[in-house]
């Protein structure tokens, strides 16, 4: 491609999910094992692996007391609690705001006001259920999302015999 790189791992984190895909020697990896609503699709398609970890993915605790992220999403509207549009559920964006990895003054180039107090209020019940501080719960959610992304990249690379060190990561997306 125009970048001069032939081996890429694409990484698209949006509001609802993260998609990863490998491009080897300038060609996207293909699959013929795909289904939509349980119906098999038997034509060559670009092999995109999707996980439920986007900026709007909801952070929650399951019945066994384990921290989870997604697949439920707050969507763009109402969006994360920090948007101030009525969203009540804690999201990955809220966790990043609590941990200062998202700067309110720089969000959308400073064109959108976000509210850390709403993020904190939304994540507090999760922290209490886990018996953690708010900051530790936010850190744990971020670490879980990162681990899920790493696992997705492993599924498309090392588990298929490719070394991700031979590839350039190309991140893009809205989150």
Question: Where on the chain are the PLM-derived regions?
Answer:
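N-terminally biased helix-coil "hinge/interface" segments that flank
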Residues: 1-175
